[in-house]
A protein has these predicted regions:
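Rhodanese-like catalytic fold shared by cysteine-dependent sulfurtransferases
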Residues: 2-57, 68-69, 80-214
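Compositionally biased, charge-rich low-complexity tracts
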Residues: 63-64
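Structural scaffold elements adjacent to functional motifs in cytosolic proteins
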Residues: 74-76
Length: 214
């Protein structure tokens, strides 16, 4: 059991460090961002809010204004290659890119994921830090599970969450709040697939109709 835990931790840390190394120096001066008071999380209207819980004020369209804050952490909840068929709903199973400064922490490594669209199918179903039971409670699979989660999502920081379409980010916020995090410090920024800002780090390139991933 301890060996499995070490492997799981190593996988998460390797993805975080390996993918985002070198992307933590932001272009321009973001010092003023730290001094600004953040608006409280507010759910968007319509399907973006009702289904995904994407924030009304801090989302794909505005996140550039809130990057580089020393009082915040930035987490992208996607997998490098998701077993789910996200192409079936207009997305990308591969991590085709990310917003500069966001660290990749795949939700399916943290807890089991259910309720995905039928066309997408199943995502990763291996070992996880937590298991969500039939009652919606998150049960730690290891003694160290909570300690690891608190290291990834510091409770004294604002937490900005993103993913491909907004679903994994919303599920992550639900999990954290259920486990004792302050919901007023967690923002579901929404969908990378809808992001058109100035801090996009491209991983996917299409050449002569073929997709390539750096």
């Amino acid at each position: 059991m301890k060996k499995v835990l070490i492997i799981s931790i190593t996988a998460i840390i390797s993805i975080i460090v390996g993918l985002t190394a070198g992307y933590f120096i932001f272009k321009g001066d973001t010092t003023n961002n730290v001094e600004e008071t953040l608006p409280k999380p507010e759910i968007s209207e319509g399907i973006r809010g009702e289904q995904f819980g994407i924030d009304k004020n801090i989302n794909e369209s505005t996140i550039d204004e809130y990057l580089g804050r020393s009082d915040s952490v930035y987490r992208d909840m996607r997998m490098l290659k998701d077993p789910g068929n996200y192409e079936a709903i207009g997305g990308d199973s591969y991590l085709s890119g990310f917003v500069e400064g966001f660290e990749v922490v795949p939700l399916p490594y943290l807890t089991n994921v259910t309720g995905l669209p039928e066309d997408v199918g199943e995502t990763y179903t291996g070992d996880t830090l937590f298991t969500q039971d039939d009652s919606g409670n998150y049960v730690a699979n290891y003694e160290e599970s909570m300690e690891i989660l608190e290291a990834i999502f510091p409770k004294d920081k604002n937490i900005f969450l993103m993913c491909g379409g907004g679903g994994y980010a919303g599920m992550t916020k639900t999990m954290l709040v259920s486990l004792g995090w302050d919901e007023n410090k967690i923002y579901n920024v929404g969908a990378y697939w809808s992001y058109n800002g100035n801090n996009k780090v491209e991983v996917k390139k299409t050449i002569d109709g073929e997709d390539y991933y750096n």
